Amino acid sequence: MDPPKLTFISKRDTKKKDEVNKEQPTKNLKILDLFSNDEEFSNPTQEEPTNTLQEKLMNVDPLEFFSKGGLKEEQKKERDDHRDDYRDSRDRDRDYRDNGGRDRDRDYRDGGGGGGGRDRDRNRDRDRDRDRDYRDGGGGRDRYRDNDRYRDTDRYRDNDRRDGSGSGSSRRRDERRENSGRRDYRDNDRRDDRRDNGRYGRDNDNSGGGGSGKNSSDKKEEINPVSNNNDIHKDRIKRDTTQFSHKVFEQINNKRDREDPELRDIKVDYMGIKRDENRKKIKGEKGKFVFEWDSSEDTSSDYNTLYTKKLEIQPQFGHGNFGGYEKNNNNNGNHYNGNIYNNNNNNNNNNNNNNNINNNNNGSMIGGKQISELPDTHWSKKPLKSMTKRDWHIFKEDFNISTKGGIAPNPIRTWQESNLPREILEAIRQLGYEKPSPIQMQSIPISLTGRDILGIAETGSGKTCAFVIPMLIYISKQPRLTKDTEADGPYALVMAPTRELVQQIEKETRNFAQHFGFRVVSLVGGQSIEDQAYQVSKGCEIIIATPGRLNDCLEKRYLVLNQCNYIVLDEADMMIDLGFEPQVTSVLDAMPSSFLKSEDDEMAEKQESDRSHIYRTTILFSATMPPLVEKLSKKYLRRPCTITIGEAGKVVDRIRQTVIFVKSENDKKEHLTQLIKDGPPPPIIIFVNKKKHCDIIAPVLEECRVSYTILHSGRSQEQREAALEGFKKRKYEVLIATGVASRGIHVDGVTHVINFDIPKNIEDYTHRIGRTGRAGSAGLASSFITDKDVEIMYDLKQILTSTNNIVPIELLKHPSSQQKHGSSKDHNKSVIFK
């Protein structure tokens, strides 16, 4: 067995270590002063009364201090107590051993055994080993300690055997077992002290107590023996230090509750103590919605006076002839009691007058409420300058206006607040437009900024006026046309899908343009192209045309668009459906591309604000947004602002829809006769899918003695114009038409629309019934449907359900109404290819 390696410590290191130990008590007092109680902080007799807790904490780190074992004075005192306990225990063991030796000698003499002889042999061997170790140079002290340990083990083993043969052995053995766990580390530490010969105490006290002559301070070098139990000793010191640190922190935490909140926060932040962030949140606190406005802008107060001003009642205990009240009682405690009686009395006397409400008076109604019933904080009772962002948001919600595509200017509330030119306001007054429609409210201010617009609005929403007014304002800012500039073409161009719609837009535009002195020319089929070319050659500011005739004029060089930078596409979805996409594309390509804005949104925004240069403005209006229209808008519109009024393709709620399931054409005639006789009074529009069906309906109307006219593509342009004009002037009570009259034809006062032949798609159905219920009036739409009309059944059922109209039982249970036509696949059928 190799002897353990020796570690030598020089005298200089020992001296340096002693100096550190002398400074240690001062540091201990300093750090303990940091955690003194509040009375010490407030004591005016201290040496440093001006020092605050923050200044002391800045100089000393408590965690670093405790990790380095700075509190050795307390540990030393605890060691002294352990050493005193060890001395007392050693004396008790010696007395016990002496008494036990005498007992063993007595037992041996009495013939009890040879225990005493073994003790004498063991003591003799121990003395011999000790003499040999000292003679060899003191290096055998480790073996001496090992022998002592083995000797103690043998002694306890002998005691166990001896106790097993004597009285009370089980009691003493149980006590040793109970005390064994408590004696483990303490006995080992005491043996460490004995092995080190008081080394631990001398290092801290600078005194050599309990050592041999070789450990005196006169020697230049001294020996530091290595022990296998040093790890246990270090672990215990570390554990004691950690426990002491926790006690100090517990004292700090207890004192934190009594301290000033500011000082507590300073301590917590400096010492890195984590706050209790896992606070139990109140139910509903996490997802609680917080409004962006304060309570002063709240417009959600009840409109009913019974809730805004509570009725305070003093009970009369059954007295009174009107619900417990006396009508002549003037008791001030009962508010409104006289008014309740008087109001009910007046209501009973004037029942007929109160029931006749004028629903067409839209000027006094907002969101289904009378303006007088609205609170004072409502936007309708605020001046324009007092409107907040929230007010504009509510304004758009009231009129079902939504925009996207960047920041859009605020809509106009009234014509008086619009700041439009005097000529426009005069034309509006003459035409009798009391207030703008939702599409006009939002479209006009956006168009005046020069932005492109993609407008989606229901039929009969006033889209014509929405693009005519900004178009005229744009032209008014351009130089007047001369004989030299007239050859370069018009300033503005409007395209519509049908002749009737073109003529209607022309009439509407002339009503406004005459106040500016602008000239308007229409180009439609069915008329002489030479006569139209002659009108264009004389010069005009605005051209309104169908795509086909306009493209013919461009190809024959009757017209050029060199200075046309304002273009409107009305009813774009219908133009695409009628197959005018090539003509529309050809016309747009004929316009100068140098005036087209950049495709980059940032650059296009800068170009819109540049008033020194003219850029093209494109406005596209449509009732629906099919893929082809969306493709067209992406190609020719730059940074457009999308305006949606209501929902795309949605039927207005003012139209009541009825669907009649019929079995044959004869059933249609019978139901048509009944609708003409028992239905709303004229004017009435009857739609058919084929021109020959007009001849089928004519005899039925003659039997009902109703005047009628026919409008379809097979008639000449003069006949079509005469038919439409006669129907508008009430010369004819019924108009029989094909799909040409379903888009954009506005006839005032149409009360009833009858679909003798229901269309194949829901879009055409929407536009047909949109001829009634215009300008805020109510309307009725009746449709005949057969088993062959499977293409529209699913969509028709959906639109009837969404508008709270009655769905006939035949349509509700029909297989084609359960899923969209063309989307089902019969998986039960198998196809075998040969």
UniProtKB/Swiss-Prot annotation:
Q: What is its EC number?
A: 3.6.4.13
Which residue ranges does the record annotate as region Disordered?
1-245, 322-371, 813-834
Coiled coil (UniProt feature):
none
Q: Motif DEAD box at which residues?
A: 570-573
Query: For this protein, what reaction is catalysed?
Result: ATP + H2O = ADP + phosphate + H(+)
Q: Where is the composition biased (Low complexity)?
A: 328-362
The UniProt family comment states: Belongs to the DEAD box helicase family. DDX23/PRP28 subfamily.
Q: Where is this motif: Q motif?
A: 413-441
In the UniProt record, the gene name given for this protein reads: helB2
- The name of this protein is ATP-dependent RNA helicase ddx23
Q: What does this protein do?
A: Probable ATP-dependent RNA helicase which may be involved in mRNA splicing.
Where along the chain is composition biased (Polar residues)?
Answer: 42-54
Which GO CC terms are listed, alphabetically? catalytic step 2 spliceosome; cytoplasm
Comp. bias intervals (Basic and acidic residues): 10-25, 70-110, 117-164, 171-205, 231-245, 823-834
Kindly give the InterPro entries that the UniProt entry links to this protein: DEAD/DEAH_box_helicase_dom, Helicase_ATP-bd, Helicase_C-like, P-loop_NTPase, RNA_helicase_DEAD_Q_motif
Which keywords label this protein?
ATP-binding, Cytoplasm, Helicase, Hydrolase, mRNA processing, mRNA splicing, Nucleotide-binding, Nucleus
Question: Domain notes, please?
Answer: The Q motif is unique to and characteristic of the DEAD box family of RNA helicases and controls ATP binding and hydrolysis.
